[in-house]
């Protein structure tokens, strides 16, 4: 199966986790896009969706799915999103698409987090995929120095990219993240960091993993 076929497979499987007559959170990226296309087929069953990026909001609207502002919603029944890496405890690296901050905010309001990805995203230890950090532009160089001092790795500015919040992304290459919860917390304590792409303090509850033999359901 192609990677796109695996993504579509998990997108279809994720529909089972959509709770009727509730608001749901929708992530950003290629796998999330497959989910949005599937969600469109049952759009009458939900009250609406909260998007984690402008791109996701546009795709939802194109399908006629009601898009809500997060500030007008008290609770989301589920948040469904992809990942760039997932370890055995369902700690994740996300943010390859640059929407990590809004993804974390939307997730914070959700009762359940269902991660959807193909099996190429499964890893024993996080860090082979560069870890994104959203940074206030004037703090870019300072944050890069602090990251190297504390964790090693090689920070690279994501050229020509600005987040939906008007900030920049540093991608940290060459990490081996053995304690993702501690690292997530410490990174977020560096002045100038908005947030980082570790989803460990709040990890996935369920990982729907697309394989050549079908969808594997992994629970945290």
UniProtKB/Swiss-Prot annotation:
Catalyzes the reversible conversion of ribose-5-phosphate to ribulose 5-phosphate. It catalyses: aldehydo-D-ribose 5-phosphate = D-ribulose 5-phosphate. Belongs to the ribose 5-phosphate isomerase family. Keywords: Isomerase. It comes from the Bacteria. NCBIfam families: PRK00702.1, rpiA. Substrate binds at residues 28-31, 81-84, 94-97, 121. InterPro entries: NagB/RpiA_transferase-like, Ribose5P_isomerase_typA_subgr, Ribose5P_isomerase_type_A. GO terms for molecular function: ribose-5-phosphate isomerase activity. Pathway: Carbohydrate degradation; pentose phosphate pathway; D-ribose 5-phosphate from D-ribulose 5-phosphate (non-oxidative stage): step 1/1. This is Ribose-5-phosphate isomerase A. Disulfide bonds: none annotated. Its EC number is 5.3.1.6. One of its GO terms (cellular component) is cytosol. The active site is at residue 103.
């Amino acid at each position: 199966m192609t990677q796109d076929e695996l993504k579509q497979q998990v997108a279809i499987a994720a529909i089972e986790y959509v709770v009727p007559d509730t608001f749901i959170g929708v992530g950003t990226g290629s796998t999330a896009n497959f989910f949005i296309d599937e969600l469109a087929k049952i759009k009458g069953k939900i009250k609406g969706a909260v998007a984690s990026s402008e791109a996701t909001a546009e795709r939802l609207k194109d399908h006629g799915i009601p898009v809500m502002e997060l500030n007008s919603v008290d609770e989301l029944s589920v948040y469904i999103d992809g990942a760039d890496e997932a370890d055995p405890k369902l700690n994740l690296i996300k943010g390859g698409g640059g929407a990590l901050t809004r993804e974390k905010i939307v997730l914070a309001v959700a009762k359940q987090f269902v991660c959807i990805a193909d099996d190429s995203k499964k890893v024993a230890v996080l860090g082979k995929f560069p870890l994104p950090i959203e940074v206030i532009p004037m703090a870019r160089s300072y944050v890069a120095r602090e990251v190297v001092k504390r964790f090693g790795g090689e920070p690279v500015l994501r050229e020509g990219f600005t987040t939906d919040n008007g900030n920049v992304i540093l991608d940290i290459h060459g990490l081996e993240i053995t304690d993702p919860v501690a690292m997530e917390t410490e990174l977020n304590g560096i002045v100038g960091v908005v947030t980082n792409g570790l989803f460990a303090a709040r990890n996935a509850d369920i990982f729907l993993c697309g394989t050549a033999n079908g969808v594997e359901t992994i629970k945290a």
